[in-house]
Amino acid sequence: MKFGASLIRSMLASFSLTGLMVFGVTAQPLPKPQGPVLLTVSGKIGQRNVGDSAQFDAAMLDALPLSKITTTSPSRDKASTYSGPSLKSILERVNAQGSRFRLKAADRYEIDIPAEDITLFNPVIARRLDGHEMKIRDRGPLLLMYPFDSYPKLQNNIYYARAVWQLQHIVVE
């Protein structure tokens, strides 16, 4: 059976109406982490490498396409460059299927990120700050960063609260 453009558009429209976001279909299996695990993704995902989750070490995160955001933030006086994989690329790698993403930090902070944030603002899961690996004192080793300077509507406490530092876990719901 041939899939025509109209069928694909129809499928995409139905996903949009239900609020469900489907992030990629990756045929290549996700390898197991060889180093310390920096990020775990669980929930509605199609790719797993450890039990019911997808775990990433530094090398696995670095193998994903690099994204950069240069922006100011409430925690820094000057514009800084945050680099690492985009949240979207991680969700694509694990074949995430959900409309809401719960981010959990090392200090037990949790916040939900709507799918619209990912498509509209393309936040980055930064491993590097101004070219240097982020340490715990830099709010690392992982920090979800939004392009605050590129979108003035992000410059408020709602979005500042979504910039999760010491990110460890994403639950796809």
Residue spans for each PLM region:
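N-terminal intrinsically disordered, low-complexity segments enriched in P/E/S/T
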Residues: 28-173
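Sec/Tat signal peptide C-region and signal peptidase I cleavage site
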Residues: 23-27
